[in-house]
Amino acid sequence: LAGEMETGTLGCDMMLVAEPAYSLELKEGGWLHSYDTPVKENLRFPYDEEGYWYPVRVCNMVLAYNPELKTPEELPKTFKEFAEDTSLKGRISMGNPLTSGTTMAAVASLSDKYGYEYFTALGNNDVMIESGSTALAKLQTGECDVIMILEESVLKERKENGSKIACIYPDDGVILIPSTVMTVAEDRSANMNIEACEAITDYLLSEEGQKFMVEGYMHSVLKGFSEVPFDSVDTDGLIEKDMGVDWVRCYTMRDEIRTKFQEAVTIPEKK
């Protein structure tokens, strides 16, 4: 995408990205088409008031553990304890905020709530930075006691592989992360399929479209949508305990947040 941007034209008609911060950047850069979808009044998550982006599915950052090896009483009940409990030193894992949009959103939220000292605590506790699949494998073997991970990864593992890995919904709040859909502006698009893109946006935000999101282990963005992902909990209940993400801060202070994280936490070099 970055390479295409240098040419001034994008080959894609639409984009679906992990979180709204990147949508703010694309909007500011003039890359997006504004569309006033009639579905917007049914949304229970924020959207761009000028119609440049809409949430279409919701990821949920949680903690996870292996109940065959640990009991909930032995493990942190909050994201704060996850970072600060020294009995877990070297036995915790999370994703890489430099490469993962959802992990970036999570560390932005946690540093907003607890300050950059949160990163220092993670570093002091020797948090391992790795992919979700690697972290889940380490939970299975007992190399990790608890991990920070997207709920959908745990639910998928439970349904498709019969895993016993379970979620902890932290008492200091879950971190809900809406993935956003956008249409490329006509003067920035190689194809100019605006009408089709608007129709797809409406479909993604319809009840039928939202059922596919839930089947993919993510939560619906629609008000009154009662279906939840396999083995998950009520979406409105999660909204009530959402820690929240300041998306403007996540965008405008992205470099600072990443730098502070790198200064505190060891990130393995790519092989």
Predicted regions and their residues:
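A ligand-binding cleft/hinge motif common to bilobed small-molecule-binding domains
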Residues: 21-25, 145-164
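Extracytoplasmic ligand-binding site segments that recognize negatively charged/polar headgroups
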Residues: 2, 10-144, 176
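A bilobed periplasmic-binding-protein/Venus flytrap-type ligand-binding module shared by bacterial periplasmic
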Residues: 62-69, 108, 178-193, 212-213
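Short, catalytically relevant binding-site loops at active-site mouths
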Residues: 99, 146, 152-156, 172-176, ...
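N-terminal secretory/targeting leader peptides
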Residues: 157-163, 167-176, 181
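Conserved C-terminal helix/tail region of periplasmic/extracytoplasmic solute-binding proteins
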Residues: 239-271
